[in-house]
C-alpha cells in the first residue's frame, strides 16, 4: 500500500472499482492533491470505511443514479460505492478542518474506497481520539439514526417497532430504547435472538414483515414503526398496516424504485403520518453521535463485529451480502 510511480509519470494510490456484479478490482490511480479541491472540500487519507446496506445493490451490479455510473457490467467508478469513511485530513479548503485532523462522516461522491478521498467538509466531524478508526466509522450511521429520530414524536413510553434488524435497524432499536421507548419490537427473518437484547430489543420477531403483521394483535400495534429495510416496495406497506391509530411511520430504507404503492385508505382512516428524508445538518449530528457513543461505551464495540483490511474488500462485501446472525457492522481498515 502507499504511493507508487505511475507509468505515465507522477505517483499513484490504490482504489477499488466494481468491474462486474459481485466483483471488485484493485487499481492504481493518479495521486490526488490539494489542487483537486473545490471550496469547502477536504482531501482525506483513508483510515477506515463502513459497509452500508445501501452499498449492496451497487455491489450486485444494479445501476444507480450517479452520473458516473455508466459501466457495462457494473458501475466501474473508482472508490464506489462506499460513503461511510474515517480519514486523516491531508489538505483542506474548509475552515473547520485542518491538516492532521482525524474525521468521520460522508464520502460525498460515494467514492470512499480509495487511498485519497476528496469530499465535502460539511459532512465531516472530528471524533474521540480514543476510538479506533474501525469503531469511529460507526458514528456515521449512528448520526443518521439520531437525525431520523429527531423528526419523530417523543419515543418515551412508546411502543416502537423496527422492521429490519440488519446493522442500521439494530442501531434504531438501541437508540430507541436509550431514548425511553417502553417496548422495542425488532422484526427480521435473520435470527437475532443472540444479540437483540443487547441492542435494546424487547420482542424479537424472527419472521418476514408480512407474516408479522398478519399475526399482530390490534391491541399491540406500535405507535411508531420504522422501516429499515428498503430496496423493495413491500415492507413500507407492511409498516403502514402495522401502525396503531394516530401513529407514525418512518421510511428510512433507501428506495430503488421511484414509486411505492401504499394504502392511502389505511393512512387516512388510521390518521397516520408518514415521514422520510435524508440526513441534514451532518456535522452537528456527527458530533451528537460521538457524544452518544461516549455515554454508551459498549455500543460501538458490540456493533462492529467484523473488520477486514483493504486487501480483503471482496471478502468483506461478500460477507455483507450473506444473512449471518452473528454479523452486524463490517469495517474495512487501512
Report each predicted region and the residues it spans.
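Glycine-rich beta-strand-centered segment in the early N-terminal region that forms part
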Residues: 34-50, 64-109
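C-terminal hydrophobic helical "lid"/dimerization subdomain
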Residues: 2-11, 237, 283-334
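NAD(P)H dinucleotide-binding glycine-rich loop of Rossmann-like/cofactor-binding domains
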Residues: 72-84, 102-163
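Short amphipathic alpha-helix with an adjacent loop that forms part of the alpha/beta core around
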Residues: 210-220
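Short, well-ordered loop/turn sites that connect or cap secondary structure elements
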Residues: 96-97, 154, 243
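Glycine-rich phosphate-binding loop and adjacent beta-alpha segment
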Residues: 202, 232-295, 334
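Mid-domain Rossmann-like dinucleotide-binding core that forms the NAD(H)/NADP(H) cofactor-binding site
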Residues: 135-207
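A short N-terminal beta-strand-loop micro-motif at the entrance of redox/enzyme domains
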Residues: 2-6, 20-48
Amino acid at each position: 500500500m502507499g504511493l507508487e510511480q505511475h507509468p505515465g509519470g507522477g505517483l499513484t494510490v490504490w482504489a477499488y472499482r466494481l468491474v462486474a456484479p459481485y466483483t471488485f478490482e484493485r487499481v492504481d490511480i493518479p495521486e490526488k492533491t490539494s489542487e483537486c479541491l473545490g471550496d469547502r472540500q477536504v482531501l482525506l487519507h483513508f483510515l477506515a470505511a463502513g459497509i452500508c446496506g445501501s452499498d449492496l445493490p451497487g455491489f450486485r451490479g444494479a445501476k444507480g443514479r450517479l452520473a458516473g455510473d455508466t459501466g457495462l457490467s457494473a458501475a466501474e467508478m473508482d472508490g464506489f460505492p462506499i460513503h461511510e469513511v474515517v480519514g486523516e485530513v491531508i489538505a483542506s479548503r474548509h475552515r473547520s478542518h485542518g491538516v492532521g485532523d482525524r474525521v468521520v462522516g460522508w464520502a460525498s461522491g460515494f467514492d470512499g474506497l480509495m487511498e485519497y478521498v476528496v469530499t465535502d467538509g460539511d459532512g465531516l466531524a472530528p471524533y474521540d481520539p480514543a476510538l479506533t478508526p474501525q469503531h469511529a466509522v460507526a458514528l456515521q450511521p449512528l448520526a443518521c439514526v439520531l437525525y431520523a429520530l429527531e423528526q419523530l414524536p417523543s419515543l418515551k413510553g412508546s411502543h416502537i417497532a423496527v422492521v429490519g434488524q440488519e446493522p442500521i435497524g439494530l442501531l434504531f432499536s438501541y437508540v430507541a430504547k436509550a431514548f425511553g421507548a417502553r417496548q422495542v419490537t425488532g422484526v427480521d427473518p435473520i435470527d437475532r435472538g443472540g444479540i437483540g437484547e443487547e441492542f435494546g430489543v424487547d420482542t424479537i420477531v424472527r419472521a418476514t414483515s408480512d407474516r408479522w403483521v398478519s399475526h399482530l394483535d390490534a391491541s399491540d400495534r406500535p405507535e411508531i414503526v420504522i422501516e429499515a429495510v428498503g430496496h423493495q416496495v413491500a415492507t413500507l406497506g407492511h409498516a403502514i398496516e402495522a401502525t396503531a391509530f394516530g401513529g407514525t411511520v418512518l421510511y428510512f430504507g433507501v428506495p430503488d424504485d421511484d414509486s411505492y404503492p401504499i394504502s392511502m385508505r389505511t393512512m387516512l382512516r388510521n390518521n397516520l403520518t408518514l415521514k422520510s428524508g435524508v440526513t441534514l445538518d451532518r456535522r452537528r449530528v456527527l458530533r451528537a453521535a460521538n457524544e452518544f457513543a461516549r455515554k454508551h461505551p459498549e455500543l460501538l464495540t458490540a456493533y462492529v463485529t467484523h473488520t477486514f483490511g483493504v486487501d480483503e474488500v471482496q471478502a468483506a462485501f461478500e460477507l455483507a451480502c450473506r444473512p449471518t446472525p452473528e454479523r452486524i457492522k463490517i469495517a474495512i481498515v487501512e
